[in-house]
């Protein structure tokens, strides 16, 4: 094996993304047609392409949608599920309701979305999996090499296999990256971890020394720092703190035996749980209970998220007078861009609630809250599936695999399948979606309405210090900046601010997000890169050279110097190094996982906004309006003083995507929500507008 010092020298040679020049001949046909596949829970997307969309016009269906041929037989959930939102380090599980009522609105904890299996997708449940976990002991121990030895240090792999060059993406803006974090936080949060700041469980001392096994907490899985680390060796850091995710074996869940399965404490659905919370108790803490509104606090003429009651605990604050927010998700304060979008989504709820109240003054608080929430979620799903996901998965891929449809504006897509498990896949949350950390930019520009750069912020200075967005005109300036500044290219480079300075507080260095991603892969016992390649219909590699179809020779040499065997390559690592599929922002292995996940997320959601159920759905006129929702409109309606935006806010400004007045950007006409039973002649000319 090559010495660690030599490997680190390789890391400094500046090899960047040779893989980006490779082309994948299979195009969007990610999965080969395998009717005899040994993976019964996989939907086989190349086969999906042969199925006709089930699109219905303005009348509701009189017969059920055709059965999805790729779903596994219905089976009861194998674990107990709970409803409480745990603090870091704890998880509380409870059984789902024995009986579900069919109501017009989602529950807050995700229960009863599937009426016959009410625990599917609920908060505090197990992640799903595509492949059996690969624990070292078959039960819960982190993954090891096929030789029985430990795998190479996650930090070493981060340094050698991944660069840190600044390569802006000419096509996509920082809002594209930031919306991805919104979706990530909405779908997944590992039990037992803060995931946004310094963890209370210490596996390393404050000066970076490893705590002995005899005194370390049982959940410790510290990342070993190589002795000649180009950053941490300057301050003598020997390890990076890492705490394992809690599983069904660690909690009071009804453990069913077999390998441990990690728990997620948020709902699996795209339901804006990060805005509304994952339980009645959590939601009650952030609701105003008047006019259907959520709590906001007014300062300096603007409306903000409510302040935390534990400022020094929730934020990296020196004293309790600093701005620190509370919301439906404890990670709200993690970075300025995230806090801005959570504020915008909260303001959007209240904007809708106020408009509905004016249109339907007979509505009580509960009806206004639920209707505003329902519309807010529908707009969010429209933006996510029809504006954001095509950038990542490719529009052609999504159409072929029935994630989106070219349907008439008022037509329903009745594709809900009660046999589809909507649970977030471990391979998705722990590996595939984390690849897009490469889009993070360490410099955040502040722009005027004329798009002149007024200044910039350094990301690591403002982790868990969100108060900067309330200073002066920073809220609008950062919002414009994120809509104008390019994100980092989706490649093998990770910005220095997250590779050496993550959550650094007042220290010279912080943690390394790419190292954390790799270590989490091993903590969760994810199947190897080679196993997942085969699962997704690619050729299994029988030697290092077998990876050459998707990974460039220089990168393969780096991997060979790191791993004892080609069978050891972590999924998070190998799939991140693949050449991208044309038209998408990922290689075929991650694209396979992402496509599978977002198919399940859509088809496994009874409340998905395009479904035409008479009780849970929208009218054809309302659905036609919801399809006008856009990221640009969301920003225009909920900034402080934003008056212009490009129509496609996830894409950089160009001749085909110019900055235009907000008044020219289509908006959802909320007058379509007038209760016709009581108000047949309301003059609605100004309702629903800013």
Swiss-Prot record:
Main location as per UniProt: secreted
One Pfam family of this chain: An_peroxidase
Site entry: Transition state stabilizer: 331
Compartment(s): Secreted
Family: Belongs to the peroxidase family. XPO subfamily.
Organism listed in the record: Drosophila melanogaster (Fruit fly)
Glycosylation sites recorded in the entry for this protein: 310
A GO biological-process term: egg chorion assembly
Keywords per UniProt: Disulfide bond, Glycoprotein, Heme, Hydrogen peroxide, Iron, Metal-binding, Oxidoreductase, Peroxidase, Secreted, Signal
Active site: 185 (proton acceptor)
Binding site for heme b: 437
InterPro entries reported for this sequence: Haem_peroxidase_animal, Haem_peroxidase_sf, Haem_peroxidase_sf_animal
Disulfide bonds: 100-112, 315-324, 536-592, 636-662
GO cellular component: egg chorion; extracellular region
Catalytic reaction equation(s): 2 a phenolic donor + H2O2 = 2 a phenolic radical donor + 2 H2O
Enzyme Commission code(s) on record: 1.11.1.7
Co-factor: note: Binds 1 heme b (iron(II)-protoporphyrin IX) group per subunit.
SUPFAM superfamilies, sorted: Heme-dependent peroxidases
Record protein name field: Peroxidase
Signal peptide: 1-20
Cofactor (UniProt): heme b
GO molecular function annotations of the record: heme binding; lactoperoxidase activity; metal ion binding; peroxidase activity
Protein's job: Involved in the chorion hardening process, through protein cross-linking mediated by the formation of di- and tri-tyrosine bonds.
